[in-house]
Every structure is written in C-alpha cells, then in structure tokens.
Amino acid sequence: IARKKTNQNCAVMIAKGNVNGIEITAGAINFDFIGGSCGAAESEAIIYGVQHAIDNQTPYVFFPCGGGQRMFESPIALAGMTRTTLAINELKKNKLPYISCFTDPTAGGITASFAMLGDIHFAEPGCLIAFAGKRVIKATVKEELSADFQTSEFCEKHGFVDKIVHRKDLRKDIGNILSILLKKQSEVTSGSLNETSENIEPFTKAAS
C-alpha cells in the first residue's frame, strides 16, 4: 500500500545535485511511507547515500523525518540504528561534511542514531524532535515540562540544533555553510601538508 501511495520502494530517497555550485549527495525520508519509519531497506538506502558521498567526495545533506525504527519488521530494523551510525562515522573519517536538516516529526530511533550526528544541525520551525514521547518523559522524571519541550526551538536553546531555518531558506543556508566548511577544510589540509613537508626536510638531509 505504501509503495502504491508514494511510488517509492522504501521511505528513503537519495539524490545528487548541487548547491552554490557545490556537488552534494542528499537524502530524505517520506513520512507518507509508513510514517517515515526505518526498516532494513531504509537503512540500506541511507548507507548507500553515505557510500555515494564517499565515492564522489561530496558533502551529505539529509532530511530526517519519521517516528523511528519499524519494529514490526524484526530486530533487523533496530540494527539499522547501529549500521547507519557506523556509516556516518565513515563519512566523518573521510572528512566530508554531514548536514542534518530536521523536519516534522523526527523521533525515536531516527533521532537516536544518524539524525543527531550531523556536523551542522538545521531544523524547520516548530518541528517535533524527540526520542521518547513527552508523556513518557513526564511520567519518568515526575516534573512539569515546558510548553515548547521537544520542539526545534527548545532544541536550539539547549544546543542540539544550530539554527532554525524555514524550508524556503534552506538552500541558501546550506550553500553558505558548505562554502565555509569546504574552504576551511581546504585551508587546514593545505596547512597540514606544508607542516608535514617542513617536518620531513631535516630527516631527508640527515639521510643524504
């Protein structure tokens, strides 16, 4: 039913494109596909996106959405949290920027894995960003929670989101931050090479 409704094989879509002339790999979760829940196929798609970014040396921009792991699919869905986390770590080892752009709602195992691992976190205004539900947390801590608890505004205030950006402005902000990150990375790499060359020179002379 979900495939017929969305014309997709799974909830995750992966694409390539460019922002400000910068080639990127992008991914998004379609909430209309079983509530954006992540099963085995979705995890594979996210990992494929990471591999595409590494193979093509592009930043990875992802738009998470959904209620978490698709547990009726078996523990394989839960294992997707670990697998996607390990994949994002590989992206970071390759020094490629990873930007997570939270959409409404982002919850459960999605929040607790790849969605919260971005170098930069953008969020649309008023998004629900959570792991467990508000009532569950309230019952656990036995305290009153603020009205904006688990919203993108609350997350920004507490350091989990870098900036709240309206969808119409996302392209501009993503382009700006990627330009800064890639320029800085280029300068750092260049500096490291120069430093390495200076360090190697005395050893070269000693060996000659």
Could you describe each region identified by the protein language model?
Residues 15-18, 120:
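Short beta-strand elements
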Residues 1-14:
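An N-cap/entry alpha-helix motif that binds or orients negatively charged groups
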Residues 8, 19-22, 94:
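Short flexible coil/turn linkers enriched for glycine and charged/polar residues
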Residues 17-28, 45-70:
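A structural preference for short, pocket-lining loop segments at secondary-structure junctions
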Residues 67-185:
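Conserved catalytic cores of soluble enzyme domains
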Residues 176-195, 200-205:
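C-terminal intrinsically disordered, low-complexity extensions immediately downstream
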Residues 27-30, 125:
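A secondary-structure boundary/capping signal
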Residues 31, 38-47, 55, 66, ...:
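Conserved mixed alpha/beta catalytic, RNA-binding, or beta-rich assembly cores of soluble enzyme
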